[in-house]
Amino acid sequence: MLILSFLCPAFLNAQIVTDERMFSFEEPQLPACITGVQSQLGISGAHYKDGKHSLEWTFEPNGKLELRKDLKFEKKDPTGKDLYLSAFIVWIYNEQPQDAAIEFEFLKDGRKCASFPFGINFKGWRAAWVCYERDMQGTPEEGMNELRIVAPNAKGRLFIDHLITATKVDARQQTADLQVPFVNAGTTNHWLVLYKHSLLKPDIELTPVSDRQRQEMKLLEKRFRDMIYTKGKVTEKEAETIRKKYDLYQITYKDGQVSGVPIFMVRASEAYERMIPDWDKDMLTKMGIEMRAYFDLMKRIAVAYNNSEAGSPVREEMKRKFLAMYDHITDQGVAYGSCWGNIHHYGYSVRGLYPAYFLMKDVLREEGKLLEAERTLRWYAITNEVYPKPEGNGIDMDSFNTQTTGRIASILMMEDTPEKLQYLKSFSRWIDYGCRPAPGLAGSFKVDGGAFHHRNNYPAYAVGGLDGATNMIYLFSRTSLAVSELAHRTVKDVLLAMRFYCNKLNFPLSMSGRHPDGQGKLVPMHYAMMAIAGTPDGKGDFDKEMASAYLRLVSSDSSSAEQAPEYMPKVSNAQERKIAKRLVENGFRAESDPQGNLSLGYGCVSVQRRENWSAVARGHSRYLWAAEHYLGHNLYGRYLAHGSLQILTAPPGQTVTPATSGWQQEGFDWNRIPGVTSIHLPLDLLKANVLNVDTFSGMEEMLYSDEAFAGGLSQGKMNGNFGMKLHEHDKYNGTHRARKSYHFIDGMIVCLGSDIENTNTDYPTETTIFQLAVTDKAAHDYWKNNAGEGKVWMDHLGTGYYVPVPARFEKNFPQYSRMQDTGKETKGDWVSLIIDHGKAPKAGSYEYAILPGTDRKTMTAFAKKPAYSVLQQDRNAHILESPSDRITSYVLFETPQSLLPGGLLQRTDTSCLVMVRKESADKVLLTVAQPDLALYRGPSDEAFDKDGKRMERSIYSRPWIDNESGEIPVTVTLKGRWKVAETPFCKVVSEDKKQTVLRFLCKDGASYEVELEK
């Protein structure tokens, strides 16, 4: 049974959960099953972690506390389907640290089966989550019926609370610390290695601090302070809000001991996942006892203290409140050496901790608590991880997001010592290597501008990571600790790419990860920080490109912080305005909307931009997943990267958003993501069946294709193409296949499909040309009269469609759907244009062209004389030419077995993407790309079940994920003799009057181009 607690003082000390396995000691009498040997036992209100009481155990040397009852230990699932393990969970309070340990022993009928030691050299609360079968000595047995706690060879007193004899928990997350350093010893998860990394030693020598270095330390401290704090005033309203929030925690002192409402990290609730019905992972947050709000209040108090007048009553009040909260949270176990049993993803919970302590550095010094506070910050920021020289480029995006601020705060908290200098040198080196292009699917930044998390390009995580990266690049800029030019330029390129694929600020739907809600955006402040960090080579005080990009982006960022998703960094509008003013005063002006073409090999993404519109294609492959689904996140977005093409647009002069582009969540048919060729399923069948498939992953679904060919080519950064072999995973409709291509030529996008097939006889297969929300009167009036016939269609947003194949128009007023996160029913008015391939199609195909930002007259003329002609459209290749643009675009799915149509390009020796542009009678621009990232070669690394079906496996289990992209030679044969300036990636194999043979060395899914001259 769960006893819920609500956000009011009367309930904040209620016992969290009652269960026969849980001991919280809230009854006045000792439980009958608990006895002691050479011990005094009692119920105490002096210290408590759950409810208002704990068990007080005063022991003589080698005394024992015994609990006799069925411990409810369960063995791990022998079938391997359930990966959870039985864990013992306990909180211990110690008033007097002892360099000793107590021993927990688990017995069956008096015979010891398993045990573990717990160090007691601490003051305050500490926790242990210890898995019986993995972490303990001995062999646990079902039916164990006694817990014995054995004291060390010394007197002492401990308080015990929130003891759970056994409960099944996710076995990945238990955390070692100073008390239980042996727990989960094999983990390399970066959230869980606090203890291991606390032992790391520096490889940079200690040196005296020079005068210049001392000045730089002051500069760093000032820059950091300005970054996290903007001077303001403390209003009476703000002071009153702080008082009310502070009073909720009921912090009091008695006999020199602090007490108050128990505080937990959000993940502590995972102890109850298998104990209570309707378990809610966020229950502790809802109960008001989670530490994120606590640290946010500490930061708020620190800001109020800094904003108030010296010697004023409110300043003294804020100081008292801050110190009381500091004492209480330290007592609660937020201290050096403590990991609360389960600490995964704690970065978000302690985000406010670091700036709060840093802003009160002087107060903590005055109170003699600075050293303790420093150590606390260094422990949770895992600052010692920066000591060894990085072995390779890149770090996890979460480290940038949640650890950079903590690490630099923990270092800048220190006095100006040689140790501080050593930390600063180590830290700047760590940031430098972290910002460099990472190999394979490793985090965080890619050579092409991709920003990686969860082994894919993931803007929603990148905005948090870029917050850390850009802040640190600025912090160290123009000092002896500045990052390298490569690191600086890599992050700059990531931001330039992001402002290209976002329009104006919003992520494309297909690039929204598990948040396809239209709310994710880039953060203009990142561009501001890079603008004032100067040029990558360190020569310029400002970066012109970043300044111009920032001034364009910030002008339209009128969204309120309240509307922003939780993962978006919080930004001060005052700071935005201040930097914008500074840049304008220095002569910088906003850039125009970016134009051209971008291909992200590490995102399976192609983007074409003209005027204010963008077209974003996304696919997936054997390297890059199609969609990320969690329980309660992205339930229906299976087809997001099945060759989708989203047009983001707005009337001239308006800011482009999902809404101006005809998208909203209400009523959106998740089957009909524009551009996608998919089986149109009932939403119950489309809903992700989220599983925990292996020990490398949690409850999540990220499905892969077994095809390596998926990605784009970009020619001269102005035009391009995109192709993919679509093969759906066997988890759902594994017989579904298609060959899809997009050809981006100036303001025209030609969309081709062939070889569409599956054996699903229950539901039709469709290619969606558009699906648009109809949200206002003008749009309703527009569609009343229909907006197309035959081959020509115009939507109400100014986009034209040329469709030379039979298509079906649907007007669904209303159309019913479901929310991506809750599954709750929604409705809206929508129009769709689709190509129906029928049920279980064989050799299906389609052809259409899109012209955004056009008019009916132009479209009518286009239909009479299309600006392109298709030369080949089959399983082997999609090839077209645009005579007016003098471009021929090749998507070669298979190695050509005969001469290719189109003139210049005769053969290639492998599948690839090619674009040829005739620049003059004697000059040609040739671009070649191999979309296969080649992280491994040969057949796809699938595992098959007994029926020969591809099994679902997590990306994290694959051994090749951190491999460098391999080089793939692509040999092209051109008609006639051509002169080529050789490059490291392009060599002439042979040439004569009849033909010229070139060999390109392709990697990273990148585009390589050369100029050919007669």
From Swiss-Prot:
Principal subcellular localisation of the protein: periplasm
Entry protein name: Chondroitin sulfate ABC exolyase
Signal peptide feature range: 1-14
Function: Broad-specificity glycosaminoglycan lyase, which acts in an exolytic fashion degrading chondroitin sulfates and dermatan sulfate to yield only disaccharide products. Has a preference for chondroitin 4-sulfate over chondroitin 6-sulfate. Has extremely low activity against hyaluronic acid. Is not active against acharan sulfate, heparin or heparan sulfate.
InterPro entries xrefs: Chondroitin_ABC_lyase, Chondroitin_lyas, Chondroitinase_ABC_I, Gal_mutarotase_sf_dom, Galactose-bd-like_sf, GH-type_carb-bd, Lyase_8-like_C, Lyase_8_central_dom
Binding site for Ca(2+): S24, E26, D50, H53, D161
Residues the UniProt record annotates as site (Important for catalytic activity against dermatan sulfate substrate): H344
The reaction(s) this protein catalyses: Exolytic removal of Delta(4)-unsaturated disaccharide residues from the non-reducing ends of both polymeric chondroitin/dermatan sulfates and their oligosaccharide fragments
GO biological process, one term: chondroitin sulfate proteoglycan catabolic process
Residue numbers annotated as active site: H345 (proton acceptor), H454 (proton acceptor), Y461 (proton donor)
Positions of disulphide bridges: none
Compartment(s): Periplasm
GO cellular component, one term: extracellular region
Cofactor annotation comment: Divalent metal cation. Requires divalent metal cation for binding of dermatan sulfate substrate, whereas it is not necessary for the binding of chondroitin sulfate substrates. Prefers Ca(2+) or Mg(2+), binding 1 ion per subunit.
Site (Transition state stabilizer): R514
Coiled-coil region: none
Keywords: Calcium, Carbohydrate metabolism, Lyase, Metal-binding, Periplasm, Signal
Residues of the site described as Important for catalytic activity against all substrates: R172, E628
UniProt entry tagged with the keyword rRNA-binding: no
GO MF: carbohydrate binding; carbon-oxygen lyase activity, acting on polysaccharides; chondroitin AC lyase activity; chondroitin B lyase activity; chondroitin-sulfate-ABC endolyase activity; chondroitin-sulfate-ABC exolyase activity; hyaluronate lyase activity; metal ion binding
Keyword Signal applies: yes
